[in-house]
Amino acid sequence: MDSAKSELAMPAVGEVFDAYASLRGLAKGQTKVAPSHDAGLGGWLVSVFDLDAAGIAALVAGAVAGSAVLAVDGQRERGKQLLRYGICDFVVNDLDEALRILKNEVRRKQPVSVCLSADSEASAREMVERGLQPEVMAGRNVLTAGPLRDRGAARLEAGTAPGELVTWKLRNEAAAWAAGPVLARVDELAAGALGEDVEETLWRRRWLQRAPRYMGRRLGAERCVRMRDAEATRMMAALHKDAALAAQVIVVRDGTPVEL
């Protein structure tokens, strides 16, 4: 197969965050969470139909949120690429195999992502026959999964979450071996800058803590979160106080590079 044809179109990290924010919005009011704790969406199933950039964003968002994710795409190579990138956990050829994996993790309320190489419409029918009902559906081919929608699955719509998008990555990309510890320190500053009185702070902190695990090699080199103006200002002030850390990263605030 021509590598140019098979290469996946990957989402920007901001698109993944926005998909995550949309998913959390759908879950609002449906999960019982202690005021000081975000338990995530463990026990939920997110079904993604087609692994284009938006579908990949939904897959990663679901895993970060704590859901089990079943991604259906007719091109097996797409799932295999995501497996190589560290973005999905399993690639399977039939729904029975997917069900064996998903059933255990949904029961344990643990995140897992399974890419199924199959036709979207046929898979949706088979899911109904097997009693596999997702809480949320996403992806370009989601309209082929009408029976699942009729049975109560919500549709994850593409959109832009409120707030300024703040991104950061290593300044010296050649030193990728150092990216993890450096970016993790910036992640902590970002989490600390989030307002304690802001409703979405708990799940944004979950994002900052867990997204690196599920972004894989292709997406994990850049981090992001959406912030209110005062939060972004606090984060920049914290970076200014740590000159050694600031010198190692490039930070972009709402599309504009920040001088650190």
Q: What do these predicted ranges mean?
A:
Residues 45, 66-70, 135-136:
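Beta-sheet entry/capping signal
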Residues 36-60, 73:
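Glycine-rich adenosine-cofactor-binding loop
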Residues 1-42, 143-144, 154-186, 195, ...:
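Glycine/serine-rich phosphate-binding loop and adjoining beta1-alpha1 elements at the start
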